[in-house]
Amino acid sequence: MTELVGVVLAAGLGTRFEGGNKLLATVEDEPVVVRGARSFPADVDRVIAVVGHEADDVGEAVSSVVDETIHNPEYERGQSTSVRAGANAARDRDADAVLFLPGDMPCVDPRTVRRIVEAHRESEADAVVPVYDDRRGNPVLFDADCFDDLVDLTGDTGGRALFETVTVRRLPVEDPGIHADVDTLDDLAELEDG
């Protein structure tokens, strides 16, 4: 049995990013998606990248930092299709929980991920979401009890659509990286400068 599956959501088109595939853009000479995947610490039992757009290139980029890649042929239909693929993979591996991280978030501190995992183990909540500066961020952990709901998601909402129907533990963290994503060239430049 796998206790915890980490899923890097790395399938999207990234249409607001005008410099090629944002996941393959580099921060400190490393692809954005690789830096994000590295935020999963050793206590995440299995790390899976869900790829779609430019799947071969993204899959090759993350191959050294994930345990496997899963191709999402429906990636153009929104983030929920990748969440579904990740939740199905976690369920297939009999996981206790799944932790989702968008692939365009290269600055999440691994200690934050560790705290989220610990909070899940200490809590009865269905989901654990990190909070910095009174705003929710990523990654978000969902207990196995949520897998059926996750595989039923549609559109471009991701797992946050469940926050109204499940018990959510908001976990205060001192990590601005839970909000730092790369959607535009300006976002990338800001990360390079910071």
Where are the regions a protein language model picked out?
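Conserved alpha/beta core of the MobA/IspD/sugar-nucleotide pyrophosphorylase nucleotidyltransferase superfamily
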Residues: 2, 154-194
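Nucleotide and nucleotide-moiety/phosphate-recognizing core
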Residues: 3-102, 107-136, 167-174
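Alpha-helical elements of the RecA-like P-loop NTPase motor core of helicases
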Residues: 15, 56, 60, 148, ...
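Short histidine/acidic/glycine/proline-rich micro-motifs that form metal-
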Residues: 104-107, 146-148, 177-178
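A generic structural signal for short hydrophobic patches within well-formed alpha-helices
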Residues: 113, 146-150, 188
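Glycine-rich phosphate-binding loop of ATP-grasp-fold ATP-dependent ligases
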Residues: 135-138, 179-181
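Short, glycine-/small-residue-rich phosphate/pyrophosphate-handling segment
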Residues: 138-164
